[in-house]
Amino acid sequence: MGILDIVPTGVITGDNVLKLFTYAREHGFAIPAINVTSSSTAIAALEAAREARSPIILQTSNGGAHFFAGKESSNEGQKASIAGSIAAAHYIRSIAPFFGVPVVMHSDHCAKKLLPWMDGMFEADEAYFKIHGEPLFSSHMLDLSEEPKKENIAQVKEYCKRAVPMKIWIEMEIGITGGEEDGVDNSHVSHTELYTQPEDIWDVYRELSSVTPYFSIAAAFGNVHGVYKPGNVKLQPALLGQHQAYVKEQLKTTNDKPVFFVFHGGSGSSVNEFRTGIKCGVVKVNIDTDTQFAYVEGVRDYVLKYKDYLMTPVGNPEGADKPNKKKFDPRVWIHEGEKTMTKRVLTALEDFYTVNTL
């Protein structure tokens, strides 16, 4: 049995998201969550999923959503980020079935100061639900980790109450992920603050599970967003196993992995770190920085190779009257970026044991 025996292709929601994550947890793999900022980056990720016969998660950050709506657009009141996220969701919904893979449409890190963005997406979900019987987005991520724990959990719980009638999946963060990500800057925190305690996980699980089964937890185990040299970050994904054991004991259950965990700050981490996390119940891994660099690699190499064909519309080493349109056509050099990004997503799918799970 594979994933397509239990969920459909295209954007999935509600119980199908729960089925997908449960299947991943039971079969020992995780699904890459790729940040997309355009139709081009979305296609690059979808191409990888199709080639690997794997599910995929596509997510828009606040800044990525703003870019989707036009970088020069005013984002007063988060209106551009709201519009960009909605546009991305509609686009991905329309194109995803063509690729023949299940897709989770997700919104990434929403800090407290960005909650108007979240509210705008929820309004779009509710409007879409009235017509189609399902939300526009599959899931949303609330990052209130900068707030006191009690406030963090209470506010996430309120959003869960709003989400549960539509069966929207909610991802939350407890503990601090270092570095900087759209709207959340934790680059100043000490390493000792980057580790969540088992009691924290239980507090979250106890409160949210009283409202909804559709939630996952991004626990901190030394994670850092962005670019860093190997060895500079002390990741301890095995801590997630201790968290699972603690929650199992509190629940008095036979399920060794009752919690759906998320691995943040995945760019630059080792394959062993990923796979240790997966063994401990990680079902989603965020990848952004690595795919950004992979995209620019293809464009960079193309520009360097054909630089003499990109200076003027006409005239190149082959002759002063030779046209260059076939070289500067955006469809050509943008596709070079897509190809190298697709290759990087394929690597993630292999690292996370996601290949051929359909």
From Swiss-Prot:
Organism: Schizosaccharomyces pombe (strain 972 / ATCC 24843) (Fission yeast)
Role description: Catalyzes the aldol condensation of dihydroxyacetone phosphate (DHAP or glycerone-phosphate) with glyceraldehyde 3-phosphate (G3P) to form fructose 1,6-bisphosphate (FBP) in gluconeogenesis and the reverse reaction in glycolysis.
E.C. designation(s): 4.1.2.13
Entry keyword set: Glycolysis, Lyase, Metal-binding, Phosphoprotein, Zinc
Protein name as catalogued: Fructose-bisphosphate aldolase
Designated gene of the protein: fba1
Cofactors that this protein relies on: Zn(2+)
SUPFAM superfamilies: Aldolase
Residue list for modification Phosphothreonine: T289, T312, T340, T342
